[in-house]
Amino acid sequence: FEHMPGQCAMVCAPGVSEGMFSITSSPTNKEYQEFSIKKCGELTSYLHSLQVGDEIAVRGPYGNHFPVEDKLKGKNLLFIAGGIGLAPLRSVINYVLDNREDYGTVDILYGSRSADDLVQLKEIQEVWMKTEGVNVYLTIDREQEGWDGHVGFVPNYLKEIGFDTNKTALVCGPPIMIKFVLAGLEELGFSRDQVYTTLELRMKCGIGKCGRCNV
């Protein structure tokens, strides 16, 4: 099936369980779809044990997507992610990079608890950091041996950098991080219509019937 950046899909392991996961590949990749799944329970442990050729069921896509074809087009973009929250934004970032001429500058602020928890680090270093017009800011919560980059929480680093408000921000991560990032963006002068975030952590049925996404 085809999807748009920011959408998710239900991944089903027969006889085990099923769960909603963000599709992390760009829609420009027509050959396959990718998921970035952290091993943290029965279903995810099973998915991590799969071998090439094993079969699972996937249905979707579900959820609203980021407006990459209209409201975001031509804009300078600021992506802010924490931990596995980079997963849903990766689809948008790679879509933007695949259609580079349609968008302005790209800033990516990404943090995690430790350097070991930074996902897609190889892609970040070998692709994103080497793309013209893209600036990447990495941070980890605490000092760590071997890490010579920035240390500190994402909301604090956001204030340190002090991004210009001529951007549209897309935010995803732990709820507590999102809360303080949104407050930080407001302090910097970003208006509400300049900020997009996601509620995928509350997603279950994918079609708005179960009510878990109501806030």
Named regions from a protein language model:
Residues 1-54, 112-114, 142:
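Ferredoxin-reductase
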Residues 3-5, 70-72, 207-208:
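Short glycine/proline-enriched turns and hinge-like loops at secondary-structure junctions
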Residues 28, 159, 215:
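Residue-level marker of positions within ordered structural domains that often coincide
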Residues 42-204:
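FNR/FR-type flavoprotein reductase catalytic core
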Residues 205, 210-213:
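Short cysteine clusters
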